[in-house]
Amino acid sequence: VVRITTVEDVTVIATESLSKRFPRVTALDRLSVDIGPGVTGLVGANGAGKSTLIKILLGLSPATEGRAEVLGLDVATKGAAIRERVGYMPEHDCLPPDVSATEFVVHMARMSGLPPAAARERTADTLRHVGLYEERYRPIGGYSTGMKQRVKLAQALVHDPQLVFLDEPTNGLDPVGRDEMLGLIRRIHTDFGISVLVTSHLLGELERTCDHVVVIDGGKLLRSSSTTDFTQTTTTLAIEVTDSDAHPDGTRAVREALHARGVDTHGEAGGLPGAGHILLLTATGEETYDLVRDVVADLGLGLVRMEQRRHHISEVFTSSDDQRKEAVGHGG
């Protein structure tokens, strides 16, 4: 069992050898993981088993085998109690078009057991928090995709849950809308102390937003670690330089100068506008930085960027693919 816990060793979600099999596919395969408080990302490609796991954790779909607990409650026998304490933002559009956000969220609050006055008060507060207060009386059918996502988020929060499941909350949003939604997700925990399990296939979003990340592929656990562990710095140094009249290809000039000093490099396309390509090399210490600085200065070029590369969550999938290919090779 891989653990993600706080210093207090509090577990919000726990699964042990959890499996879910359908006639032609295994959606979850002996998944064992513990998740602590905070914002946790659940990442995997479409079909990896993310939505299936959420449905099991909500007590909406039985597991084939294994067990799971949410907030200390067994999902097999305490589904209703779990749903009282947990909010859920589904992936797909499921909102009634002819009612206002206020009417819908009040209804969902009442369904959660809040009395009428408290439901209206909580709805107003929640819609203000998600940025829909000015538009709260308009029919949902006239909302943009981003506004509809905020309504779904509001109904997940209105009953003041201890934990929320957000299934692909940035789907259909433009870059600005995604950034705003990610900010809201982060504040759910920092401002209100609500733990979050958020699914996404956009790995960069999770790196920026989450405290911890759980990676699953084909229903199996690939890795479960803090985001800091996933994104540790590497020994690879990325440098980018400008061109000049004397050196129309500044990147090539730097590469040749470094090679002359016994430093191997390789290139990577995609530099900033007006700058050359990026060179990658292995940093062996401070002397590498000094050498690059001196080479660029001697050539009379501008240094646009010199930074250590970080690992990314996507490397977990690359490593998994490599291991599968190696296993197939050995099997042949």
Give short role names for the model-derived ranges:
Residues M181-L281:
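ABC transporter nucleotide-binding domain
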Residues V164-E168:
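Catalytic Walker B motif of ABC-type/P-loop ATPase nucleotide-binding domains
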Residues A45-G49:
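Walker A (P-loop) phosphate-binding loop of ABC-type ATPase nucleotide-binding domains
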Residues V106, R110, A117-E135:
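Conserved ABC ATPase "signature" region
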